Swiss-Prot record:
Pfam families named among the record's database cross-references: Toxin_TOLIP (PF00087)
Secretion signal span: 1-20
GO cellular component: membrane; plasma membrane; side of membrane
Name by which UniProt lists this protein: Prostate stem cell antigen
Glycan-carrying positions: 40
Family matches, as PROSITE patterns: LY6_UPAR
Disulfide bridge map: 23-48, 26-35, 41-66, 70-86, 87-92
Naturally occurring in which organism (per UniProt): Mus musculus
Biological role: May be involved in the regulation of cell proliferation.
Residue span(s) of the pro-peptide: 96-123
Amino acid sequence: MKTVFFLLLATYLALHPGAALQCYSCTAQMNNRDCLNVQNCSLDQHSCFTSRIRAIGLVTVISKGCSSQCEDDSENYYLGKKNITCCYSDLCNVNGAHTLKPPTTLGLLTVLCSLLLWGSSRL
């Protein structure tokens, strides 16, 4: 009985895909419409990234994909700017915008509600 159980378990694990992250992926594209290829990330890649390099305010080059160690970054250069954004859910790098994590969103909503209540009580 144990043998059958382990055989079924091994078959299930072999056939069942892991819960890998999916990110949009492209290299050196001029706009987001050209960055709609979906990439299945490896299990050690826990974030999606979008890299935008804007040169002289005229040309923007976009790259997207999976990353194992992503850090938001922004650097200004003499002739342009580089901006890297990271996110952590399936297909979250659709346009490179930051997505607020739930604790951040909850904190902002709490502050906003407090300000609204405080302001209405002073009227």
